[in-house]
Amino acid sequence: MLVSGMAFSFHTHTLFCDGKADATTMARTAFEHHYTNLGFSAHAPISLETDCNLPWDEADSYVYAIRSLAQEYEPKGMKIFLGLETEYVPGIAKPDDPAYEPMQLDYRIGSVHYVTTPDEYPFTVDESEDQFALHVQDWAPDGDYRKIWKRYWCFISEMIEAGGFDIIGHFDLVKKNNIAGRWFDEENRAYTDAAFQAVDLAAEKDYIAEINTGGIARSKRGEPYPSVFILKRMQEKGIRITIGDDAHTPSHIGVYQPKAMDIAEMAGYKTLWYMDAPGVWKEVTLESVKAQLR
């Protein structure tokens, strides 16, 4: 049975990782936007030195902050969940890392940002445009930049096969810096085949994927992740989708969801899924969520 009167996102960052506001501010903003369910998803601690990930020595503080907000907002009608955006980097990080168990998480997002192996200089596909260009040209000196998407889709498929998470994050993040096809052709048959292989595997494993509004809020692409052609494939294969703000500031919360939901409808979707309790997902119509956000 479909429910109504819901608004949600399970992809929220704060000052504990690379967000620009504290958890209290992000929760308050979500509540003001009539959210009923909110998930915090700090970039998980990993062994690489980064400015983006939750440091291990702040993990306890992160857990305490989110659990405290959950207690504060539940009586007001908004459920808050504790999560991590985990990383898949072969040989370095994986979503089901047992080191995360003591945090007693409600859920995990599985994401790929890095396209490098342990013996290569680490860089991510969502770096700044200039930084990405420098790293890619050094990484692929022969100019065969198909290596970018080949590695990305390989890692996505490997992550899906390995499991250990609940939501697949920003499915085609690899496109972020590929503005006007600068690095590779997203309409090339080999590219779409690799993307569809990952989609089909996700369907086989029955994973939930997010339509991520970060591609609208923080990218020159001006469109969500994933692209419409991937969303259509997901819909055809019966993949359930949720929606994630990938919010790094309060201004990212809720604002871009209507546009993303319109795109989901173009792909054939009529409903979204939201987490009502750890491991418990429920279905709601897109129109109902739009109405809640108004």
Kindly give the residue locations of the regions a language model identified.
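An N-terminally biased module of ancient metal coordination in phosphate/nucleic-acid-related enzymes
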Residues: 1-95, 100-102, 175-189, 229, ...
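Conserved, mostly hydrophobic/aromatic
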Residues: 11, 30, 108, 170, ...
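Hydrophobic residues within beta-strands of alpha/beta enzymes
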Residues: 38-40, 108, 168, 209, ...
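Flexible loop residues that form catalytic
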Residues: 43, 113, 173-176, 214, ...
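Extended substrate/RNA-proximal surfaces in nucleic-acid metabolism proteins
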Residues: 59-204, 289-294
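Active-site-adjacent C-terminal substructures of enzyme catalytic domains
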Residues: 190-253
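Mid-to-C-terminal alpha-helical segments outside catalytic/metal-binding sites
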Residues: 255-294
